[in-house]
Amino acid sequence: MGRKLYYVLATLQLVAVFLFCGGFFPQKVVLKNDSKFIVNPEVQLASKPVFKKLVLVVIDALRSDFLFQKDSSDFEFLHGLLNSGEAWGYTAYSNPPTVTLPRLKGITTGSAPNFLDAILNVAEDDTSSNLKEQDSLLKQFHTHHYKMNFFGDDTWLKLFPLEFFSEYDGTNSFFVSDFEEVDFNVTRHVPYQMEHQKNWDVLILHYLGLDHIGHKGGSKSHFMPSKHREMDSVIKQIYEKIDGDTLMVVLGDHGMNDLGNHGGSSSGETSAALAFLSKRLKKYQSSDIQQSSNVPVEDAHPDYKYLKEVEQIDIVPTLSMLFNLPIPKNSMGVIIDELLQLLPSKLAAIKVQDNYLQLTKLKPGYEAQLEKKSAGTLLEEMREIQSSLAMAATNYNYTFLTYGTTLMIIGTLIVTVWNFQLSQEYIEHVGTSVLLGISMFASSFIEEEHQIWWWITISVLLLMQISNGKKLVVLSGLRLIRGWNNSGQKYIYDNVLHTLLKSHTSVLWWLNVVTFLSVGFPFLRNKDESEKMVSLLSVSFLALSSITYKICFAIVNGDKVPSGLYTFALRSCAMYLANENATESDISQCLVPIARIFFQICGVSIIILLFMKYALNKSTNMLNKLLSVIKFVLLLQTSSANIPLFLIFEILTSVTPDITPIFSLCLQNLTFFQFGGTNSIATVNLTNAYNGVSSNYNIYVVGVLMFLSNYAPSIYWALSLIPQSYKQKTLRLQHYYITGTCLMIACIALRYHLFIWSVFSPKLCYYAAWSLYNVVMDFAITLLGVL
């Protein structure tokens, strides 16, 4: 296939993918204008709210067991309130995608999440998700002249106009290495706010530290208990200062899985904690389950369902009722029935009817009937309406879906016919592509895709024309890769090499040092003396700066490192800070500068290599040297416990230097999953997305770093096939055409499937990201003239 046709087809694939995504992830259509009271508006307008003030404390990723289960919870003060009846607890079901932006939309508007919000969740400067024109709980508070103060996650300041808040101070939600300062910057406002309660009617606090700990160390991190106690002390500090006319609500926006990630639909991710706190509640009866339970609960529930379960969006009509506000127009929530006790019976009945009529307006063609229906009957009917609305919350753009799928089918036919030949290589490629394509129609196969790639990789290895000795070495390496991390979304194993090495830090870190040095070896293969000197300096600076950064990063995050490396990092920071008395607390000041120095060295090294090649015509082994620089970047963007895997990669490439395109394709996919990646948003790793990024957030820099950190092993094996012929490239392109076409057809056919947003949609996003990388990399290599 000619070069021009290849690039036309590659571009066509990218256009088709983004056309399809544009139709599959449209902005949700919402009802405009603000809501008004529907049933007996004059009675409701004349009524007084149950509470005068609201304190809303959002603890990011507060899973239900963190609040209610003995082995997982250290909220002693809150436990006392739950047992005395001054607090009522619930497990709040958080609709996927379980990331902050869509969940805050759900908590404030009561509407179903839009998957596009999960993607925009990392776009700090994005304004397309703004709720200025959409009816919400905060807009109703603002309209009814409640003074609101906000402190915490600045996602709120993206969602709502600043004029909603009398006072505000945002903290950045994505610097996940920060456990303490990000919460201190919220808590420092609490004493003043408690002493000046006349200055606000609604106080919103959003804490991020617990979520950050989860991302770094998982749900059982040793930092968790102290963070629980810290949050509990904040709750106590506030509760002891407020009076009976103030309602306090403590909740998580979502939960997390055992690895500390979230975004998917597992029980841990969707089970968030919720508690209403008020001295008044003691006079009334909490849910039957709570009355018969002693908190914290002794038994651990694998489904994380503790006390009574409600929908998280039920907070919206419930708070609207308690503060006598109209329910936001797009709310799909249903009033939590226990809290109806706080209203006079006649007013409570009116509020339930109002909720019923408001909810039925969201379901076209539904005949609302109030006559002779009790509040209990209406609540039950509303639950059924709520379920049906959640199932049909998206409006697809079928024109874009049709165009995108049609272009993919056309491209698939062209590239398949053009490549057709009866050879082992072609049959292996087509067989792999068809097998993966068929798997796109089953949610379980997508969730456990790593299993498919494992068996395909082993099969391809056995068919390779290499000696049995080499096959044995490669097979051993693959088995180590396979056992390194937990993969997939259904099962978690305790005994993996990743966990074992983290408990033997000396072995881990010396393996890391050896890996960094091994990646630099191609630099040292030179014939010219001047090249040798330049190469030696480049390797030295790249290795030293990257190793120093990873050690400092580990120390700042509370990970153990060998004493020798600890001393080395401390002295390096002391030199940078020009402070001989630098201590461990000073190391954090060096992280951003060291990372930037590393990236600058990478840039200078590449410029020198290109200059020596094209200006002096004397660069030896230039391609491998450029790849070594890129490998150093990939190492920096990889978690410390995964870095030794690159040492195995180096061994495999030395054993099979002439890697076949199909084996490279297998390793690109297999290693992505064995690094801990999945087809779920929950495993998108943000830990290394901020290397070298200061408080001046740049979405494009963070986006590139995030891509590199999540696709590092795949990029390694994709680059291992350079240089490659256009015949080899078209076989790879054919694979992504076939699997992409099947994925698009599956998404259309299963668009109303239960797991469309938690399984199929994330897979589509991963596919689009990798397709973009392949096209950009192909164009970049061509422009550089490497091939």
UniProtKB/Swiss-Prot annotation:
Q: Domain of life here? A: Eukaryota
Query: Which biological processes are named by the entry's GO terms?
Result: GPI anchor biosynthetic process
Matches recorded under CDD domains: GPI_EPT_2 (cd16024)
Which is a Gene Ontology cellular component entry for this protein?
Answer: endoplasmic reticulum membrane
Tell me how this protein sits in the membrane.
Multi-pass membrane protein
Sugar attachment sites are N33, N185, N397, N485, N581, N617, N669
Q: Which leading EC class covers this enzyme? A: transferase
What SUPFAM superfamilies is this protein classified in?
Alkaline phosphatase-like (SSF53649)
Question: What is its subcellular localisation?
Answer: Endoplasmic reticulum membrane
| The UniProt record lists the keyword Nucleotide-binding | no
EC number(s) on record?
Answer: 2.-.-.-
Q: Which Gene3D superfamilies match?
A: Alkaline Phosphatase, subunit A
Residue spans crossing the bilayer: 400-420, 426-446, 455-475, 504-524, 536-556, 591-611, 629-651, 671-693, 699-719, 740-760, 767-787
According to its UniProt record, in which pathway does this protein act?
Answer: Glycolipid biosynthesis; glycosylphosphatidylinositol-anchor biosynthesis
Record keywords, A-Z:
Endoplasmic reticulum, Glycoprotein, GPI-anchor biosynthesis, Membrane, Transferase, Transmembrane, Transmembrane helix
Q: Does the keyword Glycosyltransferase apply?
A: no
Q: Which GO terms describe its molecular function?
A: CP2 mannose-ethanolamine phosphotransferase activity
Q: What PANTHER family does UniProt report for this protein, alphabetically?
A: GPI ETHANOLAMINE PHOSPHATE TRANSFERASE 2, PHOSPHATIDYLINOSITOL GLYCAN-RELATED
Cited function: Ethanolamine phosphate transferase involved in glycosylphosphatidylinositol-anchor biosynthesis. Transfers ethanolamine phosphate to the GPI second mannose.
Q: Which family does it belong to?
A: Belongs to the PIGG/PIGN/PIGO family. PIGG subfamily.
Please state what the protein is called. Answer: GPI ethanolamine phosphate transferase 2
Organism equals Kluyveromyces lactis (strain ATCC 8585 / CBS 2359 / DSM 70799 / NBRC 1267 / NRRL Y-1140 / WM37)
* Annotated gene: LAS21
